[in-house]
Amino acid sequence: MTKQPEDWLDDVPGDDIEDEDDEIIWVSKSEIKRDAEELKRLGAEIVDLGKNALDKIPLDADLRAAIELAQRIKMEGRRRQLQLIGKMLRQRDVEPIRQALDKLKNRHNQQVVLFHKLENLRDRLIDQGDDAIAEVLNLWPDADRQQLRTLIRNAKKEKEGNKPPKSARQIFQYLRELAENEG
């Protein structure tokens, strides 16, 4: 018996099974390129980190070696190494790496915000005196009122005499120590 032309489609394997879970997801070539470029940028961010920060990111041995090599290479070789790191990242789960990197960035941002607050508090201490000292004592009850008054008095004298702000820096250092001892 010979098959009719319309029957030849019946022999396609898997054609008779219609499973909705096996739906093919089509991804455009542009989207694949964007993802690859984004992973290259992630790799470049990791390469730019210092050794201490790099230790806090979960990396396997191959990826770690590639990153350390990229840190030593300059110019065109570095670009090629970053492409390799991007390729290696495509084959791995990058979510833990992203989370660790975000955590490092967030810690740095929190420290910058704290320094700005301490600088503003220092400036208020120099400008307002006892009112600002009361605020500092509310924030840190173990702060030394006498030491603060001495530093403020010296900072005002330096400011009036157009001298370098040595005491203002000491006030900032003291406030930073208080903030670090609290946390």
UniProtKB/Swiss-Prot annotation:
Residues 111-183 are annotated as: Not required for functional ribosome assembly. Pfam families: DarP (PF04751). InterPro entries: DarP, DarP_sf. One of its GO terms (biological process) is assembly of large subunit precursor of preribosome. Changing D11A: Increased pre-50S subunit, altered 30S/50S ratio, severe growth defect. Its main location: cytoplasm. It is found in: Cytoplasm. GO terms for molecular function: ribosomal large subunit binding; rRNA binding. Disruption phenotype: Slow growth at 16 degrees Celsius, accumulates a pre-50S ribosomal assembly particle, although some mature 50S subunits are formed. Ribosomal proteins uL16, bL33, bL35 and bL36 are missing while 23S rRNA helices H38, the L1 stalk and H89 (part of the peptidyl transferase center) are incorrectly positioned. Changing D7A: Increased pre-50S subunit, altered 30S/50S ratio, severe growth defect. Keywords: Cytoplasm, Ribosome biogenesis, RNA-binding, rRNA-binding. Changing D16A: Increased pre-50S subunit, altered 30S/50S ratio. Changing D22A: Significant increase in pre-50S ribosome subunits. GO terms for cellular component: cytosol. It comes from the Bacteria. Belongs to the DarP family. Has several regions, N-terminal loop (residues 1-25), a central domain (residues 26-105), joined by linker (residues 105-116) to the C-terminal domain (residues 117-183). The C-terminal domain is not required for function, while the N-terminal loop is; shortening the linker decreases assembly. HAMAP family: DarP. Interacts with RluD in late stage pre-50S ribosomal subunits. Interacts with ribosomal protein uL16 (rlpP), via the N-terminal loop of this protein. Member of a network of 50S ribosomal subunit biogenesis factors (ObgE, RluD, RsfS and DarP) which assembles along the 30S-50S interface, preventing incorrect 23S rRNA structures from forming. Promotes peptidyl transferase center (PTC) maturation. Binds pre-50S ribosomal subunits near the 23S rRNA L1 stalk, where it may mediate correct positioning of the L1 stalk. This is Dual-action ribosomal maturation protein DarP. It comes from Escherichia coli (strain K12).
